[in-house]
Amino acid sequence: MGQARPAARRPHSPDPGAQPAPPRRRARALALLGALLAAAAAVAAARACALLADAQAAARQESALKVLGTDGLFLFSSLDTDQDMYISPEEFKPIAEKLTGSVPVANYEEEELPHDPSEETLTIEARFQPLLMETMTKSKDGFLGVSRLALSGLRNWTTAASPSAAFAARHFRPFLPPPGQELGQPWWIIPGELSVFTGYLSNNRFYPPPPKGKEVIIHRLLSMFHPRPFVKTRFAPQGTVACLTAISDSYYTVMFRIHAEFQLSEPPDFPFWFSPGQFTGHIILSKDATHIRDFRLFVPNHRSLNVDMEWLYGASETSNMEVDIGYVPQMELEAVGPSVPSVILDEDGNMIDSRLPSGEPLQFVFEEIKWHQELSWEEAARRLEVAMYPFKKVNYLPFTEAFDRARAEKKLVHSILLWGALDDQSCUGSGRTLRETVLESPPILTLLNESFISTWSLVKELEDLQTQQENPLHRQLAGLHLEKYSFPVEMMICLPNGTVVHHINANYFLDITSMKPEDMENNNVFSFSSSFEDPSTATYMQFLREGLRRGLPLLQP
Protein backbone atom coordinates (compact mmCIF):
# COMPACT_ATOMS: atom_id res chain seq x y z
CA MET A 1 0.00 0.00 0.00
CA GLY A 2 1.61 3.25 -1.15
CA GLN A 3 2.29 6.34 1.03
CA ALA A 4 0.51 9.64 0.35
CA ARG A 5 2.66 12.49 -1.15
CA PRO A 6 3.11 15.56 1.03
CA ALA A 7 1.09 18.61 0.02
CA ALA A 8 2.84 21.13 -2.28
CA ARG A 9 4.41 24.13 -0.40
CA ARG A 10 2.56 27.39 -1.03
CA PRO A 11 4.26 30.73 -1.47
CA HIS A 12 4.72 32.67 1.79
CA SER A 13 2.24 35.49 2.33
CA PRO A 14 2.13 38.11 5.06
CA ASP A 15 0.30 37.01 8.12
CA PRO A 16 -1.89 39.63 9.72
CA GLY A 17 -1.20 38.08 13.02
CA ALA A 18 2.59 38.02 12.56
CA GLN A 19 4.84 39.12 15.42
CA PRO A 20 6.14 42.73 15.37
CA ALA A 21 9.73 43.55 14.36
CA PRO A 22 12.39 42.79 16.93
CA PRO A 23 12.95 45.61 19.49
CA ARG A 24 16.43 46.53 18.12
CA ARG A 25 15.17 47.08 14.57
CA ARG A 26 12.21 49.10 15.83
CA ALA A 27 14.47 51.33 17.93
CA ARG A 28 16.71 52.00 14.92
CA ALA A 29 13.72 52.99 12.80
CA LEU A 30 12.44 55.31 15.49
CA ALA A 31 15.89 56.92 15.85
CA LEU A 32 16.11 57.48 12.08
CA LEU A 33 12.63 58.99 12.02
CA GLY A 34 13.54 61.25 14.93
CA ALA A 35 16.71 62.41 13.17
CA LEU A 36 14.78 63.22 10.00
CA LEU A 37 12.18 65.16 11.96
CA ALA A 38 14.93 67.04 13.82
CA ALA A 39 16.70 67.90 10.56
CA ALA A 40 13.46 69.10 9.01
CA ALA A 41 12.77 71.19 12.09
CA ALA A 42 16.28 72.67 11.95
CA VAL A 43 15.87 73.59 8.27
CA ALA A 44 12.50 75.14 8.99
CA ALA A 45 13.93 77.04 11.93
CA ALA A 46 16.86 78.27 9.84
CA ARG A 47 14.51 79.44 7.12
CA ALA A 48 12.32 81.14 9.68
CA CYS A 49 15.36 82.85 11.21
CA ALA A 50 16.58 83.95 7.78
CA LEU A 51 13.15 85.30 6.88
CA LEU A 52 12.95 87.05 10.23
CA ALA A 53 16.44 88.51 9.78
CA ASP A 54 15.56 89.70 6.27
CA ALA A 55 12.34 91.22 7.54
CA GLN A 56 14.16 92.95 10.39
CA ALA A 57 16.86 94.23 8.03
CA ALA A 58 14.22 95.52 5.62
CA ALA A 59 12.41 97.20 8.50
CA ARG A 60 15.64 98.84 9.72
CA GLN A 61 16.41 99.93 6.15
CA GLU A 62 12.95 101.45 5.76
CA SER A 63 13.18 103.14 9.15
CA ALA A 64 16.63 104.54 8.32
CA LEU A 65 15.34 105.85 4.99
CA LYS A 66 12.52 107.70 6.75
CA VAL A 67 14.86 109.19 9.33
CA LEU A 68 17.87 109.99 7.12
CA GLY A 69 16.42 110.42 3.67
CA THR A 70 17.98 109.03 0.49
CA ASP A 71 21.25 110.97 0.66
CA GLY A 72 21.65 110.35 4.38
CA LEU A 73 21.09 106.63 3.92
CA PHE A 74 23.70 106.62 1.16
CA LEU A 75 26.24 108.15 3.54
CA PHE A 76 25.26 105.73 6.31
CA SER A 77 25.55 102.72 3.97
CA SER A 78 28.98 103.83 2.72
CA LEU A 79 30.25 103.65 6.32
CA ASP A 80 28.32 100.50 7.29
CA THR A 81 30.75 98.12 5.61
CA ASP A 82 29.22 94.91 7.04
CA GLN A 83 25.68 96.11 6.18
CA ASP A 84 24.28 95.31 9.63
CA MET A 85 22.65 98.76 9.93
CA TYR A 86 24.88 99.65 12.88
CA ILE A 87 28.01 101.84 12.80
CA SER A 88 30.83 100.34 14.82
CA PRO A 89 33.75 102.45 16.11
CA GLU A 90 35.96 101.01 13.38
CA GLU A 91 33.41 101.95 10.72
CA PHE A 92 33.06 105.46 12.19
CA LYS A 93 36.84 105.96 12.16
CA PRO A 94 37.00 107.75 8.73
CA ILE A 95 34.45 110.33 9.90
CA ALA A 96 36.26 110.83 13.21
CA GLU A 97 39.55 111.41 11.40
CA LYS A 98 37.95 113.90 9.03
CA LEU A 99 36.22 115.84 11.83
CA THR A 100 39.25 115.93 14.12
CA GLY A 101 41.76 116.47 11.33
CA SER A 102 43.84 113.61 12.71
CA VAL A 103 44.92 110.95 10.22
CA PRO A 104 47.37 108.52 11.83
CA VAL A 105 50.18 107.03 9.78
CA ALA A 106 49.04 103.69 8.39
CA ASN A 107 50.55 100.63 9.99
CA TYR A 108 51.46 99.10 6.65
CA GLU A 109 53.90 101.93 5.92
CA GLU A 110 55.58 101.50 9.29
CA GLU A 111 55.87 97.75 8.77
CA GLU A 112 56.74 97.63 5.08
CA LEU A 113 58.89 100.76 4.72
CA PRO A 114 61.00 101.17 7.88
CA HIS A 115 63.70 103.84 7.90
CA ASP A 116 67.34 102.76 7.85
CA PRO A 117 69.78 105.69 8.34
CA SER A 118 72.67 103.83 6.71
CA GLU A 119 71.06 103.50 3.28
CA GLU A 120 70.74 105.87 0.33
CA THR A 121 67.84 108.26 0.02
CA LEU A 122 66.06 109.39 -3.15
CA THR A 123 64.26 112.73 -3.21
CA ILE A 124 61.29 112.96 -5.56
CA GLU A 125 59.37 116.07 -6.56
CA ALA A 126 55.75 116.19 -7.71
CA ARG A 127 54.58 118.51 -10.47
CA PHE A 128 50.84 118.90 -10.91
CA GLN A 129 48.65 121.15 -13.03
CA PRO A 130 44.92 120.66 -12.38
CA LEU A 131 42.45 119.44 -14.95
CA LEU A 132 41.35 122.10 -17.43
CA MET A 133 37.62 122.38 -16.72
CA GLU A 134 36.93 123.75 -20.20
CA THR A 135 38.06 120.43 -21.73
CA MET A 136 35.17 118.55 -20.12
CA THR A 137 32.31 117.95 -22.55
CA LYS A 138 29.80 119.23 -19.99
CA SER A 139 31.55 122.60 -20.01
CA LYS A 140 30.04 123.29 -23.44
CA ASP A 141 26.64 123.97 -21.85
CA GLY A 142 28.05 125.56 -18.72
CA PHE A 143 27.77 122.33 -16.70
CA LEU A 144 24.00 122.58 -16.95
CA GLY A 145 22.39 120.04 -14.63
CA VAL A 146 25.68 119.21 -12.89
CA SER A 147 25.68 119.95 -9.18
CA ARG A 148 28.55 122.21 -8.14
CA LEU A 149 28.89 120.05 -5.04
CA ALA A 150 29.50 117.00 -7.26
CA LEU A 151 32.57 118.67 -8.77
CA SER A 152 33.89 120.21 -5.55
CA GLY A 153 36.60 117.59 -5.07
CA LEU A 154 37.81 118.16 -8.62
CA ARG A 155 37.72 121.96 -8.41
CA ASN A 156 39.52 121.99 -5.05
CA TRP A 157 42.37 119.74 -6.23
CA THR A 158 44.76 122.40 -7.48
CA THR A 159 48.14 121.30 -6.09
CA ALA A 160 50.03 118.11 -5.37
CA ALA A 161 49.39 116.70 -1.90
CA SER A 162 53.15 116.36 -1.28
CA PRO A 163 55.39 118.57 -3.45
CA SER A 164 58.48 116.65 -2.31
CA ALA A 165 59.16 113.35 -0.53
CA ALA A 166 62.17 111.24 0.40
CA PHE A 167 62.32 107.50 -0.21
CA ALA A 168 64.90 104.91 0.75
CA ALA A 169 66.52 103.38 -2.33
CA ARG A 170 65.65 99.86 -1.28
CA HIS A 171 61.96 100.72 -1.20
CA PHE A 172 62.12 100.52 -5.01
CA ARG A 173 63.08 96.84 -4.87
CA PRO A 174 59.65 95.85 -6.32
CA PHE A 175 60.84 97.33 -9.65
CA LEU A 176 63.62 94.74 -9.92
CA PRO A 177 62.94 92.10 -12.59
CA PRO A 178 62.40 88.43 -11.72
CA PRO A 179 65.52 86.24 -12.08
CA GLY A 180 66.34 85.47 -15.71
CA GLN A 181 64.05 88.13 -17.15
CA GLU A 182 64.99 88.97 -20.73
CA LEU A 183 65.21 92.40 -22.33
CA GLY A 184 61.75 93.59 -23.42
CA GLN A 185 59.86 90.69 -21.84
CA PRO A 186 57.00 92.14 -19.72
CA TRP A 187 56.30 91.03 -16.17
CA TRP A 188 53.67 92.10 -13.65
CA ILE A 189 54.72 94.07 -10.58
CA ILE A 190 51.07 94.23 -9.49
CA PRO A 191 48.95 91.69 -11.39
CA GLY A 192 45.37 92.51 -12.27
CA GLU A 193 42.49 90.49 -10.88
CA LEU A 194 39.65 91.44 -13.22
CA SER A 195 38.47 90.29 -16.62
CA VAL A 196 35.39 90.64 -18.79
CA PHE A 197 34.00 87.62 -16.92
CA THR A 198 34.60 88.90 -13.37
CA GLY A 199 33.04 92.31 -13.94
CA TYR A 200 34.29 95.39 -12.12
CA LEU A 201 34.82 96.63 -8.57
CA SER A 202 32.32 98.75 -6.65
CA ASN A 203 31.90 102.43 -7.49
CA ASN A 204 30.48 103.11 -4.03
CA ARG A 205 33.78 103.51 -2.14
CA PHE A 206 35.68 106.40 -0.62
CA TYR A 207 38.84 104.96 0.92
CA PRO A 208 41.38 102.64 -0.73
CA PRO A 209 42.13 99.28 0.88
CA PRO A 210 45.48 99.11 2.72
CA PRO A 211 48.17 98.30 0.12
CA LYS A 212 50.20 95.15 0.62
CA GLY A 213 53.63 94.02 -0.52
CA LYS A 214 54.66 95.57 -3.82
CA GLU A 215 51.58 97.79 -3.80
CA VAL A 216 53.05 99.88 -0.97
CA ILE A 217 55.66 101.78 -3.01
CA ILE A 218 53.15 102.46 -5.82
CA HIS A 219 50.64 103.73 -3.26
CA ARG A 220 53.20 106.01 -1.59
CA LEU A 221 54.29 107.47 -4.91
CA LEU A 222 50.75 108.18 -6.11
CA SER A 223 49.86 109.63 -2.70
CA MET A 224 52.15 112.53 -3.57
CA PHE A 225 49.43 113.66 -6.00
CA HIS A 226 46.36 112.99 -3.85
CA PRO A 227 45.76 111.25 -0.49
CA ARG A 228 43.33 108.63 -1.85
CA PRO A 229 44.93 106.66 -4.69
CA PHE A 230 43.61 103.22 -5.62
CA VAL A 231 46.49 101.13 -6.98
CA LYS A 232 43.97 98.80 -8.63
CA THR A 233 41.34 100.35 -10.86
CA ARG A 234 37.67 99.43 -10.78
CA PHE A 235 37.86 98.25 -14.39
CA ALA A 236 40.25 95.95 -16.21
CA PRO A 237 43.06 96.00 -17.07
CA GLN A 238 44.38 96.65 -13.59
CA GLY A 239 47.83 96.68 -12.07
CA THR A 240 51.40 97.59 -12.92
CA VAL A 241 53.42 95.98 -15.71
CA ALA A 242 57.11 96.49 -16.48
CA CYS A 243 59.90 95.44 -18.82
CA LEU A 244 63.68 95.79 -19.03
CA THR A 245 64.86 98.37 -21.56
CA ALA A 246 68.59 98.34 -20.73
CA ILE A 247 71.04 96.06 -18.91
CA SER A 248 74.62 96.70 -17.73
CA ASP A 249 76.94 94.84 -15.40
CA SER A 250 75.47 96.56 -12.34
CA TYR A 251 72.30 98.38 -13.42
CA TYR A 252 68.88 97.92 -14.97
CA THR A 253 66.64 100.40 -16.74
CA VAL A 254 63.03 99.39 -16.17
CA MET A 255 60.08 100.93 -17.99
CA PHE A 256 56.67 100.56 -16.37
CA ARG A 257 53.00 101.29 -16.90
CA ILE A 258 50.56 101.78 -14.02
CA HIS A 259 46.76 101.75 -14.13
CA ALA A 260 45.50 103.53 -11.01
CA GLU A 261 42.82 106.05 -10.09
CA PHE A 262 41.86 108.48 -7.35
CA GLN A 263 38.77 109.05 -5.23
CA LEU A 264 38.34 112.82 -4.93
CA SER A 265 35.35 112.86 -2.57
CA GLU A 266 34.76 112.05 1.08
CA PRO A 267 31.50 111.72 3.03
CA PRO A 268 29.03 113.35 2.99
CA ASP A 269 29.67 113.95 -0.75
CA PHE A 270 29.07 111.21 -3.31
CA PRO A 271 32.01 109.28 -4.82
CA PHE A 272 33.91 111.01 -7.63
CA TRP A 273 36.44 108.88 -9.56
CA PHE A 274 39.38 110.46 -11.39
CA SER A 275 41.03 107.95 -13.73
CA PRO A 276 44.10 109.06 -15.73
CA GLY A 277 44.58 107.17 -18.97
CA GLN A 278 47.80 105.67 -17.59
CA PHE A 279 50.93 106.42 -15.63
CA THR A 280 54.12 105.52 -17.42
CA GLY A 281 57.77 106.04 -16.60
CA HIS A 282 61.17 104.50 -15.97
CA ILE A 283 63.64 103.80 -13.22
CA ILE A 284 67.40 103.19 -13.42
CA LEU A 285 68.49 101.20 -10.37
CA SER A 286 71.36 99.00 -9.26
CA LYS A 287 70.80 95.26 -9.41
CA ASP A 288 70.63 95.10 -5.60
CA ALA A 289 68.35 98.18 -5.37
CA THR A 290 70.76 100.02 -3.07
CA HIS A 291 71.20 102.90 -5.52
CA ILE A 292 68.74 104.71 -7.79
CA ARG A 293 70.28 106.65 -10.65
CA ASP A 294 67.04 108.09 -12.09
CA PHE A 295 63.26 107.91 -11.69
CA ARG A 296 60.33 109.48 -13.53
CA LEU A 297 56.58 108.79 -13.57
CA PHE A 298 53.96 110.79 -15.51
CA VAL A 299 50.56 110.84 -17.19
CA PRO A 300 51.06 111.17 -20.98
CA ASN A 301 49.66 114.49 -22.21
CA HIS A 302 50.21 114.26 -25.97
CA ARG A 303 46.51 113.64 -26.72
CA SER A 304 43.74 116.20 -26.34
CA LEU A 305 41.96 114.18 -23.61
CA ASN A 306 43.63 111.94 -21.04
CA VAL A 307 41.40 111.55 -17.96
CA ASP A 308 38.09 109.75 -17.41
CA MET A 309 35.81 111.02 -14.62
CA GLU A 310 32.78 109.25 -13.15
CA TRP A 311 30.61 110.33 -10.24
CA LEU A 312 27.51 108.99 -8.52
CA TYR A 313 24.24 110.83 -7.97
CA GLY A 314 22.51 108.46 -5.58
CA ALA A 315 22.52 106.21 -2.57
CA SER A 316 23.47 102.84 -4.02
CA GLU A 317 25.69 101.03 -6.50
CA THR A 318 22.90 101.22 -9.09
CA SER A 319 22.40 104.97 -8.68
CA ASN A 320 22.71 107.31 -11.63
CA MET A 321 26.29 107.91 -12.71
CA GLU A 322 27.63 110.83 -14.69
CA VAL A 323 30.60 110.30 -16.99
CA ASP A 324 32.90 112.85 -18.60
CA ILE A 325 36.39 113.14 -19.99
CA GLY A 326 38.96 115.92 -19.81
CA TYR A 327 42.59 116.95 -20.03
CA VAL A 328 45.16 117.26 -17.26
CA PRO A 329 48.28 119.11 -18.49
CA GLN A 330 50.73 117.66 -15.97
CA MET A 331 50.89 114.86 -13.41
CA GLU A 332 54.54 114.00 -12.94
CA LEU A 333 56.97 112.66 -10.34
CA GLU A 334 60.71 113.01 -10.94
CA ALA A 335 63.84 112.40 -8.90
CA VAL A 336 65.85 115.57 -8.26
CA GLY A 337 69.02 113.51 -8.75
CA PRO A 338 70.51 110.10 -7.97
CA SER A 339 70.03 108.63 -4.51
CA VAL A 340 72.73 109.66 -2.03
CA PRO A 341 73.88 108.24 1.31
CA SER A 342 71.93 109.42 4.32
CA VAL A 343 75.13 109.25 6.38
CA ILE A 344 78.55 110.09 4.86
CA LEU A 345 81.62 108.31 6.25
CA ASP A 346 85.29 109.03 5.64
CA GLU A 347 87.95 106.40 4.91
CA ASP A 348 88.25 105.64 8.63
CA GLY A 349 84.53 105.15 9.06
CA ASN A 350 83.94 108.45 10.81
CA MET A 351 80.82 110.48 10.06
CA ILE A 352 81.50 113.69 8.18
CA ASP A 353 79.40 116.76 7.48
CA SER A 354 77.32 116.66 4.30
CA ARG A 355 78.22 120.30 3.64
CA LEU A 356 81.52 121.99 2.89
CA PRO A 357 82.84 124.77 5.17
CA SER A 358 81.45 127.24 2.64
CA GLY A 359 77.96 125.85 3.25
CA GLU A 360 77.72 124.23 -0.18
CA PRO A 361 76.53 120.60 -0.19
CA LEU A 362 79.02 117.89 -1.06
CA GLN A 363 78.97 116.96 -4.74
CA PHE A 364 78.86 113.25 -5.52
CA VAL A 365 80.49 111.87 -8.64
CA PHE A 366 78.74 108.89 -10.25
CA GLU A 367 80.36 106.50 -12.68
CA GLU A 368 79.10 106.34 -16.24
CA ILE A 369 76.89 103.35 -16.93
CA LYS A 370 77.87 101.27 -19.97
CA TRP A 371 74.85 99.41 -21.27
CA HIS A 372 75.32 96.00 -22.93
CA GLN A 373 71.71 95.60 -24.13
CA GLU A 374 69.16 98.30 -24.93
CA LEU A 375 65.59 98.53 -26.22
CA SER A 376 63.95 101.67 -27.59
CA TRP A 377 61.32 103.49 -25.55
CA GLU A 378 58.78 103.09 -28.39
CA GLU A 379 59.22 99.32 -28.60
CA ALA A 380 59.08 98.92 -24.82
CA ALA A 381 55.90 101.01 -24.67
CA ARG A 382 54.33 98.85 -27.38
CA ARG A 383 55.12 95.64 -25.49
CA LEU A 384 53.67 96.98 -22.25
CA GLU A 385 50.60 98.12 -24.17
CA VAL A 386 50.06 94.64 -25.63
CA ALA A 387 50.47 93.13 -22.16
CA MET A 388 47.68 95.38 -20.91
CA TYR A 389 45.55 95.21 -24.08
CA PRO A 390 45.80 92.07 -26.24
CA PHE A 391 43.79 93.82 -28.98
CA LYS A 392 46.94 95.89 -29.67
CA LYS A 393 48.46 92.82 -31.35
CA VAL A 394 46.98 94.68 -34.30
CA ASN A 395 49.00 97.79 -35.13
CA TYR A 396 46.64 100.79 -34.83
CA LEU A 397 48.26 103.67 -36.73
CA PRO A 398 47.64 107.40 -36.25
CA PHE A 399 44.64 108.59 -38.26
CA THR A 400 46.26 110.27 -41.27
CA GLU A 401 49.15 107.80 -41.34
CA ALA A 402 46.66 104.92 -41.61
CA PHE A 403 45.17 106.33 -44.82
CA ASP A 404 48.64 106.94 -46.28
CA ARG A 405 49.53 103.31 -45.57
CA ALA A 406 46.23 102.09 -47.01
CA ARG A 407 46.91 103.92 -50.28
CA ALA A 408 50.40 102.46 -50.47
CA GLU A 409 49.29 98.88 -49.71
CA LYS A 410 45.90 99.10 -51.49
CA LYS A 411 43.95 98.01 -48.43
CA LEU A 412 40.79 99.12 -46.67
CA VAL A 413 40.92 101.04 -43.40
CA HIS A 414 39.32 99.65 -40.24
CA SER A 415 38.64 102.77 -38.17
CA ILE A 416 37.14 103.29 -34.71
CA LEU A 417 35.99 106.76 -33.67
CA LEU A 418 35.22 107.44 -29.99
CA TRP A 419 35.46 109.96 -27.13
CA GLY A 420 38.04 108.25 -24.88
CA ALA A 421 41.33 106.65 -25.88
CA LEU A 422 40.82 103.04 -26.92
CA ASP A 423 44.17 101.96 -25.46
CA ASP A 424 44.14 103.52 -22.01
CA GLN A 425 41.88 103.93 -18.98
CA SER A 426 40.24 107.13 -20.21
CA CYS A 427 38.07 104.88 -22.39
CA UNK A 428 34.69 103.94 -20.96
CA GLY A 429 31.43 102.20 -21.76
CA SER A 430 31.03 100.42 -25.08
CA GLY A 431 34.60 101.19 -26.18
CA ARG A 432 35.88 99.37 -23.11
CA THR A 433 33.61 96.41 -23.86
CA LEU A 434 34.77 96.22 -27.48
CA ARG A 435 38.47 96.12 -26.68
CA GLU A 436 37.97 93.43 -24.00
CA THR A 437 35.88 91.16 -26.23
CA VAL A 438 35.73 91.14 -30.02
CA LEU A 439 38.79 93.27 -30.76
CA GLU A 440 41.07 90.81 -28.93
CA SER A 441 39.39 87.70 -30.37
CA PRO A 442 41.98 85.61 -32.31
CA PRO A 443 39.87 85.33 -35.52
CA ILE A 444 39.33 89.10 -35.53
CA LEU A 445 43.02 89.78 -34.88
CA THR A 446 43.95 87.53 -37.80
CA LEU A 447 41.54 89.12 -40.27
CA LEU A 448 42.49 92.67 -39.27
CA ASN A 449 46.20 91.96 -39.62
CA GLU A 450 45.75 90.26 -43.01
CA SER A 451 43.21 92.48 -44.75
CA PHE A 452 43.03 95.93 -43.14
CA ILE A 453 44.99 98.95 -41.99
CA SER A 454 43.60 99.84 -38.54
CA THR A 455 43.31 103.14 -36.69
CA TRP A 456 41.35 104.66 -33.84
CA SER A 457 40.73 108.35 -33.21
CA LEU A 458 39.28 110.73 -30.65
CA VAL A 459 36.26 112.72 -31.81
CA LYS A 460 37.89 115.85 -30.39
CA GLU A 461 41.02 115.32 -32.51
CA LEU A 462 39.05 114.89 -35.74
CA GLU A 463 36.99 117.98 -34.91
CA ASP A 464 40.26 119.91 -34.52
CA LEU A 465 41.63 118.37 -37.73
CA GLN A 466 38.52 119.43 -39.64
CA THR A 467 39.17 123.08 -38.79
CA GLN A 468 42.78 123.10 -39.99
CA GLN A 469 43.37 124.93 -43.25
CA GLU A 470 46.88 123.63 -44.03
CA ASN A 471 45.93 120.21 -45.42
CA PRO A 472 42.64 119.91 -47.36
CA LEU A 473 43.00 116.12 -47.66
CA HIS A 474 43.19 115.69 -43.88
CA ARG A 475 40.18 117.98 -43.47
CA GLN A 476 38.26 115.83 -45.94
CA LEU A 477 39.19 112.59 -44.16
CA ALA A 478 38.05 113.99 -40.82
CA GLY A 479 34.82 115.33 -42.28
CA LEU A 480 33.87 112.01 -43.90
CA HIS A 481 34.38 110.27 -40.56
CA LEU A 482 32.43 112.78 -38.51
CA GLU A 483 29.49 112.59 -40.96
CA LYS A 484 29.03 108.90 -40.10
CA TYR A 485 29.74 109.20 -36.38
CA SER A 486 27.10 108.55 -33.72
CA PHE A 487 27.76 108.72 -29.98
CA PRO A 488 29.59 107.04 -28.27
CA VAL A 489 31.62 104.76 -30.60
CA GLU A 490 31.42 104.18 -34.35
CA MET A 491 33.25 101.41 -36.21
CA MET A 492 33.86 102.08 -39.92
CA ILE A 493 35.33 100.43 -43.01
CA CYS A 494 36.80 103.03 -45.37
CA LEU A 495 38.48 103.36 -48.72
CA PRO A 496 41.97 104.94 -48.75
CA ASN A 497 40.36 108.21 -49.87
CA GLY A 498 38.23 108.28 -46.71
CA THR A 499 34.92 107.16 -48.21
CA VAL A 500 33.03 105.10 -45.62
CA VAL A 501 31.67 101.94 -47.27
CA HIS A 502 30.30 100.31 -44.11
CA HIS A 503 29.81 101.34 -40.48
CA ILE A 504 28.02 100.32 -37.29
CA ASN A 505 27.47 102.01 -33.95
CA ALA A 506 28.94 100.21 -30.94
CA ASN A 507 25.76 100.42 -28.87
CA TYR A 508 23.73 98.88 -31.69
CA PHE A 509 26.39 96.22 -32.17
CA LEU A 510 26.34 95.30 -28.48
CA ASP A 511 22.54 95.24 -28.48
CA ILE A 512 22.24 92.79 -31.36
CA THR A 513 25.02 90.54 -30.07
CA SER A 514 23.19 90.21 -26.77
CA MET A 515 20.19 88.71 -28.62
CA LYS A 516 19.37 85.04 -28.51
CA PRO A 517 20.57 83.02 -31.56
CA GLU A 518 17.00 82.59 -32.83
CA ASP A 519 16.48 86.36 -32.70
CA MET A 520 19.78 86.92 -34.50
CA GLU A 521 18.57 84.75 -37.38
CA ASN A 522 15.59 87.06 -37.87
CA ASN A 523 17.77 90.18 -37.91
CA ASN A 524 17.99 91.70 -41.37
CA VAL A 525 21.45 93.21 -40.92
CA PHE A 526 23.42 90.50 -39.13
CA SER A 527 22.87 86.83 -38.56
CA PHE A 528 24.50 84.39 -36.19
CA SER A 529 27.18 82.22 -37.77
CA SER A 530 27.77 78.72 -36.45
CA SER A 531 31.48 79.05 -37.30
CA PHE A 532 32.04 80.83 -33.96
CA GLU A 533 30.59 80.02 -30.57
CA ASP A 534 30.71 83.69 -29.54
CA PRO A 535 27.98 85.74 -31.27
CA SER A 536 30.00 88.95 -30.77
CA THR A 537 32.97 87.53 -32.67
CA ALA A 538 30.69 86.12 -35.35
CA THR A 539 28.89 89.42 -35.82
CA TYR A 540 32.06 91.53 -35.93
CA MET A 541 33.56 89.06 -38.40
CA GLN A 542 30.49 89.49 -40.58
CA PHE A 543 30.80 93.28 -40.28
CA LEU A 544 34.41 93.14 -41.48
CA ARG A 545 33.63 90.73 -44.33
CA GLU A 546 30.72 92.88 -45.48
CA GLY A 547 33.10 95.83 -45.54
CA LEU A 548 35.51 93.82 -47.69
CA ARG A 549 32.68 92.80 -50.03
CA ARG A 550 31.63 96.41 -50.51
CA GLY A 551 35.06 98.01 -50.53
CA LEU A 552 37.45 95.72 -52.41
CA PRO A 553 35.83 96.25 -55.83
CA LEU A 554 36.22 100.02 -55.33
CA LEU A 555 39.95 99.98 -54.58
CA GLN A 556 42.06 101.57 -57.30
CA PRO A 557 44.01 98.92 -59.26
From Swiss-Prot:
Signal peptide: 1-42
GO cellular component: endoplasmic reticulum; endoplasmic reticulum membrane; mitochondria-associated endoplasmic reticulum membrane contact site; mitochondrial membrane; mitochondrion
Disruption phenotype: Mutant mice show only subtle alterations in the muscle morphology, ultrastructure and contractility. They display increased muscle stress-sensitivity to physical exercise when performed under stress conditions such as a forced swimming test. Under these conditions, they develop muscle atrophy, predominantly affecting trunk muscles and leading to severe kyphosis. The number of satellite cells in uninjured adult muscle is reduced.
Keywords: Endoplasmic reticulum, Glycoprotein, Membrane, Oxidoreductase, Repeat, Selenocysteine, Signal
Post-translational modification: N-glycosylated.
Region annotation (Disordered) ranges: 1-24
PROSITE patterns: EF_HAND_2
Subcellular location: Endoplasmic reticulum membrane
Glycosylation sites: N156, N449, N497
Domain EF-hand, first and last residues per copy: 67-102
InterPro entries per UniProt: EF_hand_dom (IPR002048)
GO molecular function: calcium ion binding; oxidoreductase activity
UniProt superkingdom: Eukaryota
Record has ATP-binding as a keyword: no
GO biological process: ATP metabolic process; calcium ion homeostasis; calcium ion import; calcium ion transport; cell redox homeostasis; cellular response to caffeine; cellular response to oxidative stress; collagen fibril organization
Role this protein plays: Plays an important role in cell protection against oxidative stress and in the regulation of redox-related calcium homeostasis. Regulates the calcium level of the ER by protecting the calcium pump ATP2A2 against the oxidoreductase ERO1A-mediated oxidative damage. Within the ER, ERO1A activity increases the concentration of H(2)O(2), which attacks the luminal thiols in ATP2A2 and thus leads to cysteinyl sulfenic acid formation (-SOH) and SEPN1 reduces the SOH back to free thiol (-SH), thus restoring ATP2A2 activity.
Domain text: The N-terminus (first 61 amino acids) contains an endoplasmic reticulum addressing and retention targeting signal.
Subunit structure, as described in the record: Interacts with RYR1, RYR2 and RYR3.
Protein name from the UniProt record: Selenoprotein N
Gene name tied to this protein: Selenon
